[in-house]
């Protein structure tokens, strides 16, 4: 069942002493159970082979999108699940048990790309891009690391300048971009 805005509402325990810190609401408990079943049935059987062959399972990733897992914190109007940070931690934990590489791809996509776009993107970018990344049609990434600066974002040397025709000229180099070359043909990802 894909996660949507119609997923049952959060019900908090009457006393904080009764709270299950790993599943603070019924919604979180349902999410954990759904992801745990998915990991057992789909992720675990392919994990070792994908890791040995250094292969990204795009079909499995897209299945995560159809389940509502690739835009957990994105608003429902853009195809996201509209959930919270605890939900992200639950999916992260369950995926990492069987396939840390897939988990890293999920986090790079869902948190570094989708979450940043939700909070920093223009309305037109959100409308154009979020539905495709939340569904898994597109795989998101973030080019942060640079040869001379590592991950020091305040020291970034790459620049982007808009041309008179509206296109962008990007100068600089990026490296170690998780999900950076994942598309149907294995070609480099487009820049936003």
Where are the language model's segments positioned?
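N-terminal glycine-rich flavin-associated loop
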Residues: 103-124, 150-153, 164
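A short core secondary-structure module
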Residues: 167, 171-192
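Short acidic, glycine/serine/threonine-rich loops at helix termini
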Residues: 117-118, 152-156, 180-183, 187
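A structural signal for short hydrophobic beta-strand segments in well-ordered beta-sheet cores
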Residues: 158-161
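Amphipathic, small/basic residue-rich leader segments at the start of a protein or domain
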Residues: 1-107, 124-128, 132-135, 139, ...
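Short, solvent-exposed loop/turn elements at beta->coil junctions and helix N-caps
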Residues: 77, 145-149, 176
């Amino acid at each position: 069942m894909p996660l949507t805005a119609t997923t049952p509402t959060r019900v908090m325990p009457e006393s904080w002493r009764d709270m299950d810190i790993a599943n603070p609401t019924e919604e979180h408990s349902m999410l954990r159970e759904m992801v745990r079943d998915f990991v057992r049935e789909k992720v675990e059987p392919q994990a070792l082979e994908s890791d040995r062959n250094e292969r990204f399972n795009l079909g499995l990733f897209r299945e995560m999108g159809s389940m509502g897992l690739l835009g957990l914190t994105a608003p429902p109007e853009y195809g996201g699940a509209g959930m919270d940070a605890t939900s992200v931690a639950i999916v992260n934990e369950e995926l990492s048990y069987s396939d840390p590489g897939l988990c890293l791809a999920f986090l790079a996509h869902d948190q570094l790309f989708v979450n940043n776009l939700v909070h920093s993107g223009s309305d037109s970018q959100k409308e154009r891009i979020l539905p495709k990344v939340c569904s898994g049609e597109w795989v998101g990434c973030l080019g942060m690391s640079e040869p001379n600066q590592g991950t020091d974002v305040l020291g970034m040397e790459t620049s982007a300048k808009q041309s008179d025709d509206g296109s962008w000229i990007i100068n600089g180099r990026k490296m170690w971009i998780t999900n950076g070359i994942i598309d149907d043909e294995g070609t480099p990802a487009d820049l936003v």
